[in-house]
């Protein structure tokens, strides 16, 4: 009678205890038919998921999974998993588990955290968001030291808290295109054999790619790194695309840190560095910062670029540190150099621009760099050398690279000569040395007077022009004169002649430096 009661209690225990649970330590086996029934009912427990994966694949959609899914006891999962638009009402614990078949979690929503530390995925992993349903992980996602042997995609997925991929190995490609990160994103010491895509979307806190190794193309285009990006010491052997990305926030810490990193081609065209950007001791094959905006300073100290470094159209606010920066060719908006951190760095980069531009045949850029370089030298001089440099070398001579400067000075000299001839003629009229044309009467007289003034101006202007251009001075010697006036006039005319000839010579020298053909002709002349 006592054994009967115990037997009945055992039957009740089997009925009451859910599938996959144990009674008095005994494991109740689950059948494939029961797994199929759970899938058809669109609801299954986390424990049942574990038990079903020991028997067969899971192929479901719009499935609700209650509780945590803990697969650590399985060690290896040899069946594929397809669970599209599924909702896991708990965490996913798969640390150190090996998955030999593909995983399709498109549209999945995990209301908990993922612990995938040390997990191995030997087949593709798909976890893309779908616009029709909320998708992502509300808790933390820890894939540190995980290995992905095939392609992985987390496109448009939402990570509510920290996402950690430190030390992970991606033996193929990985994509986070459009993924949203509510906290930080950690990719320190990762190794990626294929392409790495992190374009679009926003990372609210710091993104770290320090000491990572990226063998393929890295695409960070249009990504908003609100907490900044730190890729110090990383190695990028493929092309790196930072175009249109935003790094940091106004008033925040460093928005971009690439110190000691190694790159192939770097394209940061149109990028915005909202806070300070540190790109020190970087080595790159080429650097493109065209149309980029550095709003809080850019530090390129010690960076070496084997090919061209282009800053064309860049907006550079704050300090621009280019000390020991080197590139085979530099394309930089000369006007942006007012923000260079130090005088020696400013002079060094201008010299580099002039030399590389002249070697490339870009005479205009070379002349602009030369002019600005001499401006910098002149402004750093002491009084009165600084003032003399500004008047004679910069404004009158154009530093021999701006032909309009001496031409403008020559025109002003001719106007001064015209005005001086007005004064001399007026003085001679007063002293009776020059005949005065009588004034007319009435309207006819006014018309005659206006015509006389125009004719007088043109006559004096032409005399000043001829005096400036004639090959010989044609100055009457004042020797023997008893008054001072002839000596003064002769001295002024001699000054006019000498100054005009000097300005003409300087103009042709500037023109020779300004025009590539004339420069070659002048350079071929041997004295």
What are these regions (language model features)?
Residues 416-432, 505-524:
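Juxtamembrane "helix exit" motif at the C-terminal ends of alpha-helical transmembrane segments
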Residues 383-406, 434-499, 506, 510, ...:
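Pore-loop/selectivity-filter region of tetrameric P-loop cation channels
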Residues 347-361, 422-452:
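Hydrophobic alpha-helical transmembrane segments
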Residues 401-425, 501:
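Selective detector of the "anchor" transmembrane alpha-helix that sits immediately C-terminal
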Residues 1-26:
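Secretory targeting and sorting signals
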Residues 23-392:
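N-terminal leader/targeting and pre-domain segments
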Residues 5-9, 413, 458:
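Small-residue packing motifs within transmembrane alpha-helices
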């Amino acid at each position: 009678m006592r054994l009967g009661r115990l037997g009945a209690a055992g039957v009740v225990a089997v009925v009451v205890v859910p599938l996959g649970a144990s009674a008095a330590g005994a494991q109740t086996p689950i059948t494939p038919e029961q797994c199929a029934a759970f899938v058809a009912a669109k609801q299954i427990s986390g424990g049942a998921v574990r038990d079903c994966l020991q028997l067969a694949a899971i192929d479901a959609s719009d499935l609700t999974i209650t509780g945590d899914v803990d697969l650590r006891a399985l060690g290896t999962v040899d069946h594929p998993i397809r669970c599209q638009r599924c909702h896991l009402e708990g965490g996913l614990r798969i640390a150190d588990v090996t998955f030999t078949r593909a995983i399709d979690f498109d549209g999945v929503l995990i209301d908990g955290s993922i612990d995938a530390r040390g997990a191995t995925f030997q087949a593709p992993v798909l976890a893309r968001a779908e616009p029709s349903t909320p998708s992502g992980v509300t808790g933390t996602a820890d894939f540190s030291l995980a290995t992905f042997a095939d392609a992985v995609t987390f496109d448009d997925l939402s990570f509510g808290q920290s996402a950690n991929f430190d030390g992970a190995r991606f033996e193929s490609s990985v994509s986070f295109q459009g993924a949203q990160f509510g906290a930080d994103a950690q990719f320190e010491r990762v190794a990626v054999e294929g392409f790495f895509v992190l374009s679009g979307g926003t990372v609210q806190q710091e993104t770290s790619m320090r000491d990572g190794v990226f063998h393929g193309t890295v695409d960070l285009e249009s990504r908003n790194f609100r907490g900044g990006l730190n890729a110090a010491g990383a190695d990028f052997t493929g092309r790196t695309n930072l175009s249109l990305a935003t790094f940091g926030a106004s008033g925040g810490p460093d928005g971009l840190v690439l110190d000691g990193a190694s790159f192939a081609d770097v394209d940061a065209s149109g990028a915005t560095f909202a806070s300070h950007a540190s790109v020190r001791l970087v080595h790159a094959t080429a650097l493109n910062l065209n149309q980029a905006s550095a709003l809080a300073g850019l530090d390129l100290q010690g960076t070496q670029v084997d090919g061209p470094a282009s800053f064309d159209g860049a907006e550079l606010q704050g300090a621009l540190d280019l000390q020991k920066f080197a590139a085979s060719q530099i394309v930089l908006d000369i006007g942006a150099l007012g923000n260079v951190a130090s005088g020696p760095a400013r002079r060094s980069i201008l010299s580099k621009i002039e030399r590389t531009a002249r070697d490339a045949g870009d005479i205009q850029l070379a002349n602009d760099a030369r002019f600005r370089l001499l401006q910098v030298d002149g402004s750093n001089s002491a009084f009165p050398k600084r003032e003399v440099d500004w008047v004679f070398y910069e404004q009158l001579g154009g530093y021999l690279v701006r032909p309009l400067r001496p031409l403008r000075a020559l025109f002003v000299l001719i106007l001064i000569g015209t005005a001086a001839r007005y004064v001399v003629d007026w003085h001679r009229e007063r002293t009776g040395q020059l005949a005065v044309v009588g004034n007319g009467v009435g309207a006819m007289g006014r018309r005659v007077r206006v015509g006389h003034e125009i004719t007088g101006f043109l006559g004096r202007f032409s005399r000043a022009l001829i005096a400036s251009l004639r090959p010989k001075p044609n100055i009457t010697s004042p020797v023997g004169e008893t008054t001072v006036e002839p000596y003064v006039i002769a001295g002024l005319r001699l000054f006019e002649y000498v100054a005009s000839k000097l300005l003409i010579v300087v103009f042709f020298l500037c023109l020779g430096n300004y025009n590539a053909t004339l420069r070659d002709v002048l350079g071929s002349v041997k004295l």
